[in-house]
Every structure is written in structure tokens, then in C-alpha cells.
């Protein structure tokens, strides 16, 4: 047994050494396109990860989401009140419920700087693990071109960069979202419980992924739904006697969460209030995007749920999240990280985002580019502060439009019984079989 383990370890080291040395040896033939792309993308991907997770984070930013978290867990450790903030200020506030405070409590046992760096490291690792799981979900490996391309693309975005620089928990939320989708796709009873546990843990911290509970409900995966409800209830109930004045969360913090603020808010309501849109127009836009979402979800459920579960789960998750950010009261740009599973569907033959309008929308909410025009502030403010809202809106419209025209084409060809995928796609799939 010992000899076998030693042999295996030696073979792994030998394989890694050979692969590293191979890059420096004279070639005996022309490299493949994939080899060239991997050689170009991996250094950029690795350095982007290091730059975002070390250089930018240690330099810091005026926006610091971790500071109120650290204050809260420090107060929790000392038995002091936590939910006593002044919400009239625009500084980041502590909004986690008592259960979230309990989960974050270990960070209060370290000094501020080590605690913050540990938090950043955990979120960086979570994003990288989520990237790996996404690759495996879509049948790619670490040796494929997709691996460095995905990592580079993720760490070049505003959502990942600001999550790490602002020191937010969204990296862990992304990992739990990917695990939730993977385990629902697995379908086994034990995996359904695990999926519910994963999304339930996110709900202990924030309700960001709450709309995704519709997926196990529609797919009759009641175990995941039960676990997703029970976990946050149990953790919060357990935390109540441990937190000083826990009811202040319900009387002070929760009304603030449910309200609408006109700063750092990319929802239709938030931007509508900021730019002074009439109430009727804000209401009309929210109803319009709810109708678009309903149409997209119905087409996805009717024609993809059983025939193409991967496409259904990932695309439906994107539709639900886009709707919630546009229509509900609060949405911030770095929430867009949760769309990575949806954006990965671009590699699927029947993807709804293989078109330039979809990626124009993605640019809007993923780019680090600033569009403020200091000489024309009226237009610059609109471009800068609305680009995320425009991007979310355009991507949701594109998704529904593609699905709707697929439906019309299939109906005209009298082939709705076989689904609504383009006619050319069915022969291609048959050939792959």
C-alpha cells in the first residue's frame, strides 16, 4: 500500500515536471492552435488573479464592505449591540441577519488586517473553485483552452474585481450557487439535500439567490426546497439568544433592506428615484420586465426542463436573477457575478446568448470602464450610472426574444412536439450521437 502511494506521488511529480519542461524544449512540430492559446492565456489569467487578489486588495478602496462586518462580529464577540447603525449615511452598512452574524463570528477573533486578508483569500479561492466546477459542469478540463479563458474573463470583470477590493462575501455566494446547480442537475436524493443546504447557507447571509428556489419547485425537487428553507430558519433561531438585542434587526435593519435607496442601486426603482422618473413609468417598467421574465421562464420550462436540464437550469437561473435585480428594490453591480453559470451557456449549441446584442448587455454590467463625461455630465452620469441597468435589461430582453422567435419558427414548421431548438440543431445532435 505504502509503495503504491509513493509510486503514485512520484508519477504525479514526474508528470508535472515533464509538462513544465515541455514548454521550454525545442519543438519537433508546429504547435496546435489550442497550445498557442493556452500559452498566451495562462500567464495572463494567473497574473490577473494575483493582481486582483493581492495588489488591488492590499491597496484598498474608499468603499470597504468588510469594515462594518468586522465591527459587527467584534461586537458579537464582546456581547455589544450590533444593529444600531445610522442609515442616513451612504457608507456601507451591516445588513446580515443574526444567523449571518453567527457564521461570520470567527473573523472577530483575529486583528482587523489579518481577518480582512483571510476573508479576501477565502473569496478568491471560492471564485477559483467555482470556475473549476463550472468548467466540469460544461465538460471542460483544466487542460482545455476554456480554463484560462474563463479565469481571465472572470477576474477582468467589475464584479470580481470590486468583490475582492471592497472585500465582499459574493465569491462564497457564487461557489454555493454553482454547487446548488450542480447538485440539482445530479438529481439523486442525497444531492438534492446538499443543493438545498448550499443555497440555504447563502440565504443565512443575504437573500440574493432567493429567486432560484423556484427551480427546485418547478423541477419537483422538494428535498432541496425543504433544506433551503430549514437551514436559514434553524441558523437564525440558534443565533437569536447569542446576539445582543437581536430584535433590532427586524425593527431597524429589515425595513432599511426592504426600502429603496437612491445611491449604489442599479434596480429600476433605485435608478428611477435617483433620476426623478415619474412613478407610473417606474411601475410600467417593472411590470414590463416581469412579463418578459414570465414569458422566458414559461418557454424554458415548457420546452427545455426535461429535454435539456443543463440548459434549463443555467439559463433559467440567469433569467430569475436578472428579473430580481431589475424589479426588486435593491441591486448592486457586483451581484452580476451570479450570472457566470448563465454566461457559460455560450458554449452550448442552443445558447440564447450567441449574438452580439447579448454581449453588448454583458459589457454593460461586467466592464470596469467608466463612462463619466466630465464636460457633459448630464449624459455622462446617465451612461455611467445606468450602464449596469441597461446591461441587465438588454440581456433579459435578448433571452426572451431568442426563445420567442424559436417558438414562432418551430410553430410555423409544425415541430413544437420536438422542442423549439433551431431546425439545423437537431441533425447536428443526431450526428454527434
Swiss-Prot record:
It is found in: Cell membrane. GO terms for biological process: capsule polysaccharide biosynthetic process; cell wall organization. Pfam families: GT87. Signal peptide: none annotated. It comes from the Bacteria. The keyword Transcription does not apply. GO terms for cellular component: plasma membrane. The keyword Glycosyltransferase applies. It catalyses: Adds an alpha-D-arabinofuranosyl group from trans,octacis-decaprenylphospho-beta-D-arabinofuranose at the 3-O-position of an alpha-(1->5)-arabinofuranan chain attached to a beta-(1->5)-galactofuranan chain. Disulfide bonds: none annotated. Pathway: Cell wall biogenesis; cell wall polysaccharide biosynthesis. The chain crosses the membrane at residues 118-138, 140-160, 164-184, 197-217, 224-244, 280-300, 310-330, 333-353, 356-376, 385-405. GO terms for molecular function: hexosyltransferase activity. Its EC number is 2.4.2.47. Keywords: Cell membrane, Cell wall biogenesis/degradation, Glycosyltransferase, Membrane, Transferase, Transmembrane, Transmembrane helix. Disruption phenotype: Cells lacking this gene result in an increased permeability and an altered cell wall. It is a multi-pass membrane protein. Belongs to the glycosyltransferase 87 family. Involved in the biosynthesis of the arabinogalactan (AG) region of the mycolylarabinogalactan-peptidoglycan (mAGP) complex, an essential component of the mycobacterial cell wall. It can also use (Z,Z)-farnesylphosphoryl D-arabinose (Z-FPA), and to a lesser extent (E,E,Z,Z,Z,Z)-heptaprenylphosphoryl D-arabinose (Z-HPA) and (Z)-nerylphosphoryl D-arabinose (Z-NPA) as sugar donors. This is Alpha-(1->3)-arabinofuranosyltransferase. It comes from Mycobacterium tuberculosis (strain ATCC 25618 / H37Rv).
